[in-house]
Amino acid sequence: VASLKKITLIATGGTIEKTYDEQEGILANGTSILELMLGSLQLDGVEITHLSLMDKDSREMTEQDHLHIAQTVGTCSHSCDGVIVIHGTDTLAITGECIVSTFPELEVPCVLTGAMRPWIMRNTDALQNLVESLSVVKLVDPGVYVAMHNCVLQFPGVVKDTKQLRFIKKES
């Protein structure tokens, strides 16, 4: 029997976690839906540790937040085979760069992912991106990556293309 891959899933908020707040009439970060999403998947061969680090719209993240996420990735990397960071897409690239500059010799893969549309919306990309990140984190070499929309890119040099709503490698 193959050994279980230990994956740490760090939740930081973002669109993927937004739900509808009926009192305010808005989409907002609140109750985590990651457990619900994970519960809908058949996840053979992995043991997932879910860590809720923060619950923020990434546009509200500070430099300290990005560093806190990076330090948490570094700490978690010693006790698992891979790390997934669920993150808002607006500043996901900033956190990715922060992780790769803080831990250039990371010993496990770290995959950042999120969603352009919340899980509660019919045309969401949330579940696809979560599933992709769960596969990618088991297959790539140690380093920092983004996995979204059937595309995997390695940091440094990843940016969000706000017109095409996807991540791309920045031209040097």
List the predicted regions and their residue ranges.
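Active-site histidine-anchored catalytic micro-motif
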Residues: 2-172
